Each structure stands twice: as structure tokens, then as C-alpha cells.
């Protein structure tokens, strides 16, 4: 890909940066914008927010994340999402309408595919149908859509391939790896390439890797683990035609949940951010 990322102004982080200038190491980089519906986020408000972002970003490439599937995160730290399948599909349709003819990167539902491994048979089938319906709507836009497949130690290559096929991967640009996780870029790269080889369809999917917090790789802890570091800066210069970009999908400094000294999931913590910066190699 030959795109230039959109670099947003972090107006809501200016005070933190004044107190901790090192955090500019994060705020100077392009980050993703996450969208969903909830008690304080109506579908209409979300649609208007997306439109404003796209207008500000034009002609540059913003990264958007859809994160609103019913029973999100299986009710764990990042629980929430739409109240019903109908509400969710309405949200997806409005999301697509908000895109217009723009071509942003869209990361579709972090962890929602691998989570099907932990769902009952009927619930898993229902989620699959919902994903396929969403993919059909998203495929009618100009967006570069990537279905999230989790981290490299979650699903085997064969299982990941099977799920992606069932979710109609051929209708979108490809898949995303390591969203909000910590696995080293080299590990993610091999996993993604193996999936691409395994699919072996007429149109081989492309993939992107979240490098926001993988500078020191992963350990056995998934929630605000100690000793992690920011990873490779966002770029489309990956030296591999199947790897579209290294992205900061998870905003470095945003918490994984109220674990290991972190605040509620999604809340920014200057202490978490500073740790990631200080541990950078």
C-alpha cells in the first residue's frame, strides 16, 4: 500500500503531555479510532463522529476499529456492545453509510472470531451469521477491511484459516493480527504468512499487524503486563506485499482492564504509557 496515515491532534492529552513530555513519543504517532454503540453512544452519534473524523482526515488514511458485537469480549473486561443482532446490523449499516466513498482502514471486531472457540455451538453459529452479514455490508464500501483473527498463540493456522473462510474473507482486504496484544512482529509475521499460504484461494488475503505494544514481545500475562514496550512505529513500508501495514491499533497507554495497576479497560493511564516508552529498546 502507498498511503499516508492521518496524524490526529490529541487535544485530550495536552495536559498529560505538559506534565509528562515523554508521552509525546506516543501522541506524535497515528493511532486508531474505536467505534461502537452503548448507553452513551447512540448509533446516530457514532455515525456523526465518523463523518467528522473522515472530513478532518481527508486526504490522509485514518484507521477505524469496529468494536460493538453483542456479548463483546464474552462479558469480560471490555464487555458491552450492541444489545441485539438487529441493533448491531443497524450500526454496521450506518457505519458503512458514514464512510461514503472514502477508503479508510477498518479493523473488524478484535477477538470476535477466536472468541467463537469459547462459545456454545448455537451461539457460535449465530455469531458467524452476524459476522457474515456484516462482511457483506462492509464489502460494498471502499474501505480496506481486515477481519481480526487474534494473536498467534490463540488459534492454530488451520483453525484460523477455517474461520476466515467461513467469515467470507475473500470479500474484504484481509485480516488483522495481534490487536491489543503483545506478540513480537516476527511471530505475527510468520503466523500471517502461514495463514495466507493455507488459504491458497485465487485472491490471497493481505494482513496488518498491531505493533503498538509488542516491542518486548509477550509474556504469559495479557492484561497490562509489566515490562512491555512500544513496538515498531506505524508504517506501510513492510517490505512484503502481503503485509499492508504495521499499525498502532491499540492506543499505547490505554488499559486492558482493572488489572496490574491499570484503570478500567480503554481508559488512558499515563503510568502505563510511560512504562511502554521507558522499556523501548
Question: Model-flagged regions — what are they?
Answer:
Residues 2-98, 251-276:
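N-terminal carbohydrate-binding/catalytic regions of secreted carbohydrate-active enzymes
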Residues 73-78, 110-122, 145-151, 176-184:
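Active-site-proximal beta-alpha loop/turn segments in soluble metabolic enzymes
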Residues 32, 59-65, 103-107, 142-146, ...:
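Structural preference for beta-strand elements that scaffold enzyme active sites
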Residues 80-102, 110-142, 157-159:
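Active-site cleft segment of glycoside hydrolase catalytic domains centered on the general acid/base Glu
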Amino acid at each position: 500500500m502507498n498511503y499516508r496515515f492521518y496524524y490526529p491532534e490529541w487535544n485530550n492529552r495536552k495536559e498529560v503531555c505538559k506534565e509528562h513530555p515523554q508521552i509525546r513519543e506516543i501522541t506524535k504517532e497515528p493511532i486508531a479510532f474505536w467505534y461502537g454503540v452503548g448507553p452513551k453512544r447512540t448509533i446516530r452519534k457514532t455515525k456523526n463522529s465518523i463523518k467528522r473524523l473522515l472530513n478532518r482526515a481527508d486526504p490522509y488514511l485514518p484507521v477505524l476499529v469496529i468494536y460493538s458485537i453483542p456479548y463483546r469480549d464474552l462479558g469480560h473486561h471490555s464487555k458491552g456492545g450492541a444489545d441485539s443482532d438487529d441493533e448491531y446490523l443497524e450500526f454496521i449499516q450506518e457505519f458503512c453509510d458514514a464512510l461514503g466513498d472514502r477508503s479508510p482502514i477498518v479493523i473488524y471486531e478484535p477477538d470476535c472470531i477466536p472468541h467463537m472457540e469459547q462459545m456454545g455451538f448455537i451461539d457460535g453459529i449465530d455469531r458467524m451469521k452476524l459476522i457474515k452479514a456484516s462482511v457483506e455490508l462492509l464489502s460494498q464500501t471502499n474501505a480496506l477491511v481486515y477481519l481480526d483473527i487474534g494473536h498467534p498463540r490463540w488459534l492454530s493456522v488451520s483453525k484460523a484459516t477455517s474461520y476466515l473462510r467461513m467469515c467470507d474473507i475473500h470479500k474484504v482486504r484481509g485480516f488483522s493480527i495481534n490487536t491489543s496484544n503483545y506478540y513480537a512482529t516476527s511471530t505475527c509475521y510468520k503466523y500471517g504468512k502461514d495463514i495466507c499460504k493455507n488459504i491458497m484461494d485465487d485472491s490471497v488475503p493481505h494482513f496488518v499487524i498491531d505493533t503498538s505494544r509488542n516491542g518486548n514481545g509477550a509474556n504469559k500475562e495479557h492484561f497490562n503486563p509489566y515490562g512491555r514496550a512500544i513496538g515498531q512505529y506505524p508504517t506501510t513500508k513492510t517490505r512484503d506485499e502481503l503485509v499492508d501495514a504495521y499499525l498502532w491499533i491499540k492506543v499505547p497507554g490505554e488499559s486492558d482492564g482493572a488489572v496490574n495497576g491499570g484503570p478500567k479497560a480503554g481508559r488512558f493511564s499515563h503510568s502505563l504509557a510511560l512504562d511502554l516508552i521507558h522499556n523501548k529498546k
